[in-house]
Design a protein with these regions (language model features):
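A short acidic (Asp/Glu
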Residues: 63-66, 87-90, 124-132
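Conserved Radical SAM active-site core
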Residues: 1-88, 98, 102-111
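Conserved C-terminal portion of the radical SAM core fold
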Residues: 97-142
Length: 142
């Protein structure tokens, strides 16, 4: 079984303590989105979980606890774009926090386990094709 944690919210950024507790207890309760009265208990033991994919824009809360994931195969889908606070007001400073976190995560768990997502891409008067091409290259060089 592959756990996608999560496309509904940023679990590493906002709920990492909860996630580590769930992994320690080896289960999670999940409501069926089509029937909120139905709750399933999902086994999270390492012998059942083939892998965990963490989707995040900010893994900082997890960085000091990565050893708690040693029993699991896991990857990070790390979303890093060139948008400023007008688009991403809740993301910490990219230059001071997020990019160093990306680098530390890659060095700690291996760059093959950190997949960079430059997503979403949209265009307007400020965020032009030229802007995205320039800053994609700037980010890639870091």
């Amino acid at each position: 079984m592959i756990i996608s944690a999560s496309r509904r919210t940023d679990i590493p950024a906002y709920y990492s303590q909860w996630m580590f507790k769930r992994l320690k207890d080896e289960y999670v309760l999940v409501k069926n989105p089509m029937n909120i009265h139905q709750v399933g208990k999902i086994n999270l033991s390492p012998d059942v979980v083939d892998g965990i994919v963490f989707w995040t824009k900010n893994p900082v809360p997890m960085l000091s606890h990565l050893s708690e994931l040693d029993k699991y195969n896991y990857y990070f889908q790390f979303t890093l774009t060139a948008y400023d606070r007008d688009v991403e007001p809740n993301i910490p400073s990219k230059n001071n926090i997020i990019i160093p976190a990306f680098q530390k995560l890659s060095q700690t768990i291996g760059r093959e386990k950190v997949i960079w997502r430059y997503d979403p891409i949209f265009f307007n008067d400020r965020y032009t094709m030229e802007y995205h091409c320039k800053y994609f290259k700037v980010l890639a060089e870091k």
